[in-house]
Amino acid sequence: VPKEVKVIGKNPIFVDESCNICQGTVLDASGGSIYIGPESVIGQSSIIGPAYVGELTQLKPYSTINNSYIGNNCRIGGEIDSSIILDYTNKSHFGYLGHSYVGEWVNIGANTTTSDLKMTYGTVSMKIGDEKKDTGITKLGSFFGDMSKTSIGTNIYCGMRIGISTHLYGNIANDVPSYVIYGQGIGSENAEMDVSSAIKFQKRMMSRRNINMSAHYEKMMKTIFDMTSKERKDYGVRPKRFTIR
């Protein structure tokens, strides 16, 4: 660990020699070990263990990572607490992500915040099928499917499930199925995401990591779209052009 980095605690800390870690970073291993992978770039940040930061991942200055797993080739900023973020996901800006699970290729817009605690301090319920189930957990954030995206200023209530390739705007107080553009939170009408558009958007995102979409990946996206069609129908969305009012 470079001498300019502040180290706290006695649990093991591993920083790959190819990592670029900035002066002023704090690594607090009091509560658990810390791993920082190859060719990662750590701006002036606080990392509180246990924590894992994968290879090629960039932490923006003044990020706070606590008790979390960050996958490979991610772009991370703001506050992350007790969460799992898989590969190629962007959360580059300020905003809070807590007690949540985030899939691959997700883009979380600036000032997006997940609630993970009810104002009543009661346990969080989730909808499973047609029923609401008490999780027995008092701190529970959201579950983001692969390729989902949030606009700036999105606020997501406790225990929400966000589908694959879904786009979110505004306040989210219920689950959102896959391939839905959710505009209800800003006064717009929800719409079904056209699968060809979703594939186009995903190809653009992959190109920013110098990755070409395989034919198998494209087929997978189409298959998931077909598999989740009933969910969208039951949700009341239909194919239409989405507009922001």
Language model regions located:
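A short linear-motif detector with a strong N-terminal bias
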Residues: 5-6, 13-14, 37, 54, ...
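Transmembrane beta-barrel architecture of outer membranes
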Residues: 22, 43, 60, 69-71
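Tight coil/turn sites that cap or link beta-strands
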Residues: 18, 24, 39, 56, ...
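Glycine-rich hexapeptide-repeat left-handed beta-helix
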Residues: 61-62, 72-239
